[in-house]
């Protein structure tokens, strides 16, 4: 029976996220991740077929973290929910600047299959606006779009 891998896929994804935090997205490569884990690049490429696959795993991790911030904010009871979403978005940018850039400011050309960080939370945002202002879904979507663009 072959030995169990000492470095798990989750560890590699977390190390890749740390590399991005420290060096930005341009610093993400197999050697940097391996150095972070104190190993060769072999575990990276045995768990991920390409660096793009590893990047996608980091995007998924960052999306989950962002979604948890939006939905589990400690400010939820102090402010209207829609305001909390904006506050958490800004807080995320301040606390995780390189992850924020990687998640929201990356080149998305040819990346049609990836979900945006907001795709999971958007229905809740629109519903919150509809309920708070007693407006139609279309009006809530337009308000959100205009707030997003101009604020």
Predicted regions and their residues:
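Amphipathic alpha-helical segments used for helix-helix packing
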Residues: 92-112
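Amphipathic alpha-helical linker/stalk segments
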Residues: 56, 60-84, 121-131
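Alpha-helical DNA-contacting segments of helix-turn-helix folds
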Residues: 20, 53-62, 70, 103, ...
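Hydrophobic alpha-helical connector segments
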Residues: 71-98, 143-147
